[in-house]
Amino acid sequence: MTAFLAVGFGAAVGAWLRWGLGLWLNPAYPAMPLGTLAANVIGGYFIGLVLAWFAEHPGVPPEARLFVITGLLGGLTTFSTFSAEVVTALTRGLWLTGSLIAFAHLAGSFIATGLGFYSLKFLK
């Protein structure tokens, strides 16, 4: 139950941060959602930082890791999770695996988003 709450509370905070970044930054340049870009870049940076920190501090309770990584950064951006998976593969020397993960996520996401967008026409 503690893990469930850690993820949930972290996700709420991350989602509020993402929303706030959008409100603050998106009006500056409407053609490029800067709030989303900021959320993805900030999330990517912080997931790298906390992954390294948790690796150096193995005694930290798993609920803290769940709150920060799965909850907070996952709520801020799922891009941070994707980035962590690719960087983890690359730091293990798995260059092909890391590249395939990156390609699969990017291509899959773009294709799925396009399909979702255009499928609305058929659902009406």
Swiss-Prot record:
Domain of life, per lineage: Bacteria
Positions annotated to bind Na(+): 74, 77
The entry's keywords: Cell inner membrane, Cell membrane, Ion channel, Ion transport, Membrane, Metal-binding, Sodium, Transmembrane, Transmembrane helix, Transport
InterPro entries: FluC
Catalytic activity, reaction form: fluoride(in) = fluoride(out)
Protein's membrane topology: Multi-pass membrane protein
Compartments (UniProt record): Cell inner membrane
An annotated GO cellular component: plasma membrane
Biological process annotations from GO: cellular detoxification of fluoride
Gene Ontology MF terms: fluoride channel activity; metal ion binding
Membrane found in the keyword field: yes
Protein's UniProt keywords contain Cell membrane: yes
Pfam family name, one: CRCB
Recorded family membership: Belongs to the fluoride channel Fluc/FEX (TC 1.A.43) family.
PANTHER family reported for this sequence: FLUORIDE EXPORT PROTEIN 1-RELATED
HAMAP family from the UniProt entry: FluC
Protein's job: Fluoride-specific ion channel. Important for reducing fluoride concentration in the cell, thus reducing its toxicity.
Name assigned to this protein: Fluoride-specific ion channel FluC
Gene: fluC
